[in-house]
Amino acid sequence: MSTKVNLLTFRISKMGILTAEEKQFYKDNGYILIRNPFTAQELEELSTEYDDLFRRKNEAKTESSWVGSDETNRKSDSPYTVKGIHNLQMHHAVFGKLLYHDKLLDALEDVMETKNIVLHHTKAHYKPPEKGASYPMHQDYHYFPYKNDSMVAAFIHLDDASPENGGLCVFPGSHKLGPLEDVGVRDNSHFHYVDQSKFPIEKSTPVMARRGDVVIFSYLLVHGSPANLSARARRMLLVQYADAHDVPTAGERAQPARGLVLRGVNLYRDATVANRHVE
């Protein structure tokens, strides 16, 4: 793992507005680390409901490491695992409330350079101690390409994270390369990832995050994470956003509440009565 930590960190101001320096850092690097924008109560509520959600769901059907296929619930012989649950806002109101978090949306507005922000999807990944699976370096772009590449993710940490417990690692500036070869498709894999010899995780930049910290990053940024071999869990949840007026360039699976306006307006949303059931 690269020892160079190329991070600009800051605490969100009262209005959540980024400085010119912070905006430029994002443009140059494709990501930015925001120090905990949540209140102690907000973070505790998220943490409590996150743990309860994973406790009450069938673990055998929440495997989310990149093994097997969805048809078999990703069953494999690997001793390593990541448990995952999508569409968090459909499980508990606290996750729906998170989508409208003003300080987070303020920062997103500055990063995305739009006042019109919609939801794409949400998910949570739990890497257990000592056996948390790694994720190869990849671009989210290949899962849901959009015309104007407005898509960004907010990666929310519920635990302190570092390479030791499988924390996020990035290649700063890689978003400027645009869409890279999807080696996963070339290898006939069910998953999408870039050439690991060109983007080895050992040369990536680790994001050293604390509980409550948020990393906002472009879906073109090359990122991944090592295995969690530590005695600590790594809990995270992620919200994916897009400009309300950006559009997908390829067919994609339906996501509950995709297109939900979180801030601003969607001027292009069809209001035709006959199409009222169309996502």
Question: Where would I find each of the regions flagged by the language model?
Answer:
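Non-heme Fe(II)-dependent double-stranded beta-helix
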Residues: T3-D28, R35-M137, Y143, V183, ...
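Conserved double-stranded beta-helix
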Residues: K14, K176-E279
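Short hydrophobic-aromatic micro-motifs
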Residues: L33-I34, A154-I156, V215-F217
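Short, solvent-exposed loop/turn segments at secondary-structure junctions
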Residues: T39-A40, A124-K127, H142, A161, ...
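Residues that flank catalytic or metal-binding motifs in active/ligand-binding sites
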Residues: H91, H120, S150, E164-G166, ...
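Catalytic core of non-heme Fe(II) oxygenases with the double-stranded beta-helix
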Residues: D106-E109, G132-V207, D246-R253
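A structural signal for short, well-ordered beta-strand segments
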Residues: T122-A124, A154-I156, L237-Y241
